[in-house]
Amino acid sequence: STLMRSSAASDVYKRQFYRRGFFVSKKRYAVIEDGEIIAKGLELVRRDWAPIVKQTQKDVLKDILKEGNTTKAINTVKKVLKRLKTGKIEGKELIIHTQITKPLNEYKQIGPHVVAAKKMEEHGIKITKGTIIQYVIVKGKGSISQRAVPYDYSEGAEYDRDYYINNQMIPAIGRIMYSLGYTKQDLEDLAQGEKQTSLDAFF
């Protein structure tokens, strides 16, 4: 039928487009060059995002750009969200790196990296401008910033699953999936294990 032919043509176009590149804006994009993903402005090239998030974004881009396979991309996201939700991610995959840009006492807004840096000072570690703070967000009471713990002192602590899903994974993956027609609610439902059938059937 005409509809089927139109749909097939659209699918071919999508596959060709995805293999060339993915553009969020002039300063945020990813392209395939010689089989490798080259990205600018996306989370996978920034150090203030957890390794598990950057790797997942890279894998999703590979599924879409290199293989033209949106179903595989969704399955990639599902698997990582499940690992996060069930507490099966290693601590080193959750480390966030943030650079100290001024003396700690000059910070008016006390972000997670500043809290973690102050905790490092309590252990006798000197923190100066330019120091890279490695920390994780752990489960507990208080704000996100208050629950930032230097990675070297996080042994035995349980990571905040909701933080890594809602504040790290969904924003980074959403950067890609929203342009394909998915919504934030779709990804939140996926994280909760709901409405997976409708997501799978999207394409």
Question: What is each stretch, according to the model?
Answer:
Residues S1, S7-F203:
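DNA-dependent DNA polymerase catalytic subunits
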